[in-house]
Swiss-Prot record:
InterPro entries: Ribosomal_uL10, Ribosomal_uL10-like_sf, Ribosomal_uL10_bac, Ribosomal_uL10_bac_type, Ribosomal_uL10_CS_bac. Pfam families: Ribosomal_L10 (PF00466). Belongs to the universal ribosomal protein uL10 family. Signal peptide: none annotated. GO terms for molecular function: large ribosomal subunit rRNA binding; structural constituent of ribosome. Forms part of the ribosomal stalk, playing a central role in the interaction of the ribosome with GTP-bound translation factors. Keywords: Ribonucleoprotein, Ribosomal protein, RNA-binding, rRNA-binding. The keyword rRNA-binding applies. This is Large ribosomal subunit protein uL10. Part of the ribosomal stalk of the 50S ribosomal subunit. The N-terminus interacts with L11 and the large rRNA to form the base of the stalk. The C-terminus forms an elongated spine to which L12 dimers bind in a sequential fashion forming a multimeric L10(L12)X complex. One of its GO terms (cellular component) is large ribosomal subunit. It comes from Rickettsia bellii (strain OSU 85-389).
């Protein structure tokens, strides 16, 4: 890489840090090109990205973006995975790492909070934002359904009492 290109790369990585509330740092040593492309495609379908970064440039960009805490994560062959949706991204990366021993999750950052490998694996077990929204909507609709049932119950009970009375006579 030419010296003149490095500031542009630092700016690109810094903008990724600023625009993406969640970033996972991983070592990719031993991944084949087809495996990396497969991971990129699955991430792209979830509006996430995968970028191989040079450690020194990633550290400079992290400092520039105010993420000094993740500088220590950059060593060895490093890539960053970034997204606006942390849970979906974590699920994809953790599942890929399970099936591919050559991808090692080092750590990451979600909403400016540094996470270690274990925390990212725990994050991947959480429901996604869309799943949470659907559960909340279901919970909000359930009381309305119950209220409708309760309101209908007295009229149907009255009808049964009248029917029972009529059948006695």
């Amino acid at each position: 890489m030419l010296r003149s290109e490095k500031p542009e790369v630092v700016e690109e990585i810094a903008s990724i840090y600023k625009d993406s509330p969640s970033v996972i740092v991983a070592h990719y040593h031993g991944l084949t090109v087809s495996e990396v492309n497969s991971l990129r495609e699955s991430l792209k379908s979830k509006d996430a990205g995968f970028k191989v970064v040079k450690n020194t440039l990633a550290k400079i960009a992290a400092n520039k973006a105010g993420l000094d805490d993740i500088v220590s994560l950059f060593s060895g062959p490093t890539a960053i995975v970034y997204s606006k949706e942390p849970v979906e991204m974590a699920k994809l990366v953790v599942n890929f790492a399970k099936s591919n021993e050559n991808l090692k999750i080092v750590g990451g950052i979600v909403d400016k909070q540094v996470l270690n490998e274990h925390s990212i694996k725990e994050l991947s077990k959480l429901p996604s934002l869309n799943e949470l929204r659907s559960k909340i909507v279901g919970l909000l609709q359930a009381p309305a359904t119950k209220i409708a049932g309760v309101l209908q119950a007295p009229s149907s009970s009255l009808a049964r009492v009248i029917q029972a009375n009529a059948s006695k006579n």
